[in-house]
């Protein structure tokens, strides 16, 4: 038995892999103008339960933007701002973010144009700073009915973290 194990181990091959790690240090990153203390609130206001008409229907929505300034420009500047949303996914409406409020059958959706940003960072968006070092990401927050049952009366709240990376 020992000779079989020895013969098997002698035939084993080992490989090595060289990994090159790269990066870049820039003068500074951009300033997010409308996020005081790294937080902002998008108030969707109040909406009646009769505004929802079935699964996936939007009861209320509101455009908002992330404004960037002071982005370094030029050869060593920031060429791209990548924004990915993360948070707790709604268990039924997986494109939406779960609400922690007491209203039921409703989720929050963050859209860039017609595309929903998903809670796992999917459908991230890219924004390119202008020559003046500024950029805007135009987004929309929406209350969305989850499933066939109409939302119940109550508050709707969700925390969505916008992960911003620069390249």
Per-range role (PLM):
Residues 1-14:
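Gram-negative bacterial Sec-dependent N-terminal signal peptides
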Residues 11-167:
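Mature extracellular/passenger domains of Gram-negative fimbrial/pilin and adhesin proteins
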């Amino acid at each position: 038995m020992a000779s079989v194990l020895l013969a098997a181990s002698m035939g084993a091959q080992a490989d090595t892999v060289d990994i090159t790690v790269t990066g870049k240090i820039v003068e500074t990153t951009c300033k997010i103008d409308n996020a005081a203390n790294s937080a902002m609130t998008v108030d969707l206001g109040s909406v009646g339960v009769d505004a929802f008409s079935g699964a996936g229907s939007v009861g209320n929505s509101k455009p908002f933007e992330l404004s960037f300034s002071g982005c370094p420009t030029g050869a060593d500047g920031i060429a791209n701002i990548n924004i990915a949303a993360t948070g707790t996914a709604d268990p039924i409406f997986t494109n939406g973010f779960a609400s922690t409020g007491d209203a039921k059958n409703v989720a929050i959706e963050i859209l860039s144009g017609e595309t929903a940003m998903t809670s796992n960072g999917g459908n991230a968006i890219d924004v390119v700073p202008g020559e003046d070092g500024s950029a805007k990401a135009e987004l929309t927050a929406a209350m969305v009915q989850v499933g066939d049952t109409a939302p119940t009366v109550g508050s709707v709240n969700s925390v969505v973290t916008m992960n911003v990376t620069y390249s």
